[in-house]
From Swiss-Prot:
Chemical reaction(s) catalysed: UDP-N-acetyl-alpha-D-muramoyl-L-alanyl-gamma-D-glutamyl-meso-2,6-diaminopimeloyl-D-alanyl-D-alanine + di-trans,octa-cis-undecaprenyl phosphate = di-trans,octa-cis-undecaprenyl diphospho-N-acetyl-alpha-D-muramoyl-L-alanyl-D-glutamyl-meso-2,6-diaminopimeloyl-D-alanyl-D-alanine + UMP
Function: Catalyzes the initial step of the lipid cycle reactions in the biosynthesis of the cell wall peptidoglycan: transfers peptidoglycan precursor phospho-MurNAc-pentapeptide from UDP-MurNAc-pentapeptide onto the lipid carrier undecaprenyl phosphate, yielding undecaprenyl-pyrophosphoryl-MurNAc-pentapeptide, known as lipid I.
The protein's name: Phospho-N-acetylmuramoyl-pentapeptide-transferase
GO BP annotations listed: cell division; cell wall organization; peptidoglycan biosynthetic process; regulation of cell shape
CDD domains per the UniProt record, alphabetical: GT_MraY
Amino acid sequence: MIIWLAELLQPYFSFFRLFEYLSFRAIVSILTALGISLWMGPRMIKRLQMLQIGQVVRNEGPESHFSKRGTPTMGGVMILAAITITVLLWADLTNPYVWAVLAVLLGYGAVGFVDDYRKVVRKNTDGLIARWKYFWQSAIALVVAFALYAHGQDTAATQLVVPFFKDVMPQLGLMYIVLTYFVIVGTSNAVNLTDGLDGLAIMPTVLVAAGFAAIAWATGNVNFANYLHIPYIPHSSELVVVCTAMVGAGLGFLWFNTYPAQVFMGDVGALALGGALGTIAVLVRQEFVLVIMGGVFVMETLSVILQVGSYKLRGQRIFRMAPIHHHYELKGWPEPRVIVRFWVISIVLVLIGLATLKVR
């Protein structure tokens, strides 16, 4: 929005040329989203407390979590608000990639909102029926997948980029739709599974978003794309503004979500952020790098799959509890230790993911 205003005023005030620079808009995007989150935080927490919208804690969970019962949840609303407002202000709204990410962010946020509402307001611990949650996640992902395929069919935007191999970029064809579907839905649910401790999900989300900001910038710059032997995708650099908005909003939320948390993001935040990360990975053609950088999310998801599979096939559990962060809690690790160590793992994995762009 502001970029349009700047274009109108440029002939009269040279200062407004500054708004054309992606680097400037990326910086102010972080600051804007951070400011909105910090401003909304206390007000939203107070409002949630007044409405008695508190966290529902499973009785079979770790005993240390019983003290979290009643902590305000659905704080993801302020994350989505901060991201959306920031993107509308600072991004180029003629860019279809920006709208693709916003569509998934808000669509999945709506699904998560209904799920949270049923849990904490209707006092239904199961929330939205699983098949309906999966149906709406699938519907949104498929609509976006078909739209992106139609927009970039048989171009670099629908190639598969394989890490470590600079000349391996097969054209996916219709398999692009299938891959896009699984990346968006899978990442959304993976982030949701990770969101079980104070700050555990939001910090890796911030780190992965920061990593994708760098990747989006390189992918949208023909010189850097050629240098790194990755597909040059015109206009993908505008996703830098979206990624930095996620970074700023996430850091602002972390201010209130750090241990001991004053508010939880709920499904409205976790499903939306995961879906947005998956969409960005698809748009910049770095699905494999998402698996590396988002390794904490992958680890949490695999722990659940292995736990359920082992119990059904052998009647035995592999972990004391899944997702795996609960396993370490039950081993006696204090919650802050689990959180910070998972953060450290995430930092290392993001750096490895970025390194794969050069190691080819």
